[in-house]
Amino acid sequence: MSILFHNKGQIVQLSNDTISYVMEVVDGKYLVHRYFGRKIRNYRGIGNPLYFKRGYNTEHDSSVENVSFDDFPFEYPVGGHGDFRIPAFAITQEDGITFCEPVFKSWSVVSGKPKLQGMPQIRVNENESETLEVICEDDRAGIRLFLYYTIFENHGIVLRHQKVENYGKQTVFLQNIQSMSLELPAEEYELMTLYGTHAKEANMQRFPIHYGAVSYTHLRAHETLRHL
């Protein structure tokens, strides 16, 4: 189990005996997803998308040539700056402004897993896990976004949670804050859901993932055995 930094601290790799998770900071401010899958020894940029000039794209105006944000693998995407996918994070400020672009500020490693106040959670000994804390900020909106990634010594999972801090002078309304957003290679995947009713819970169904949005939810005000 390890959390290692490469390329002068611009790439971070979380690994154990089973899996690896890799992120990179581009242009010193954009946090992008690079890899999640079977364990790799060292990330060397294999599998990164190749960028080229295309029509109808909003181009990035900095040092990364031909990058367009609508196909950029953001680790935690937001809207309003050329990324037209569903955002993982969205706010409305007191003055009605909805634009928010938290950019990378720092990351650090802590032993164990941070405790979540008032929330159900996994409990683990401190020497059995490590956590990467990533801090992103939007100075204009006064928003600080904390992203947490916990990797375990003996389990092939990465545990994630987020925290938002308002250090500005305005009231901020959270419109959307997702548990995660994950970029995966273009392959054939299946979606597995568990549907049911009273005394017939957790019936498995699987089907291929297709283009478009798929949503599973329920309309009750508590944990339910049904989904819609």
Write out the residue ranges for each language-model feature.
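Residue-level detector of beta-strand face positions
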Residues: 13, 133-137, 163
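Conserved small/polar residues in nucleotide/adenosyl-binding loops
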Residues: 217-227
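Extended, loop-rich substrate-binding clefts of extracytoplasmic carbohydrate-active enzymes
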Residues: 78-155
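Broad, structure-driven detector of short, well-ordered beta-strand segments within folded domains
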Residues: 12, 19-25, 145-151
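Acidic (Asp/Glu-rich), glycine- and aromatic
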Residues: 15, 28-29, 35-39, 50, ...
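Acidic, aromatic-enriched beta-alpha/helix-loop junctions
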Residues: 36-60
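Short, Gly/Pro- and small/polar-rich lid/capping loops
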Residues: 1-9
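Beta-strand/loop-rich accessory regions of lumenal/periplasmic or secreted enzymes
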Residues: 64-70, 187-216
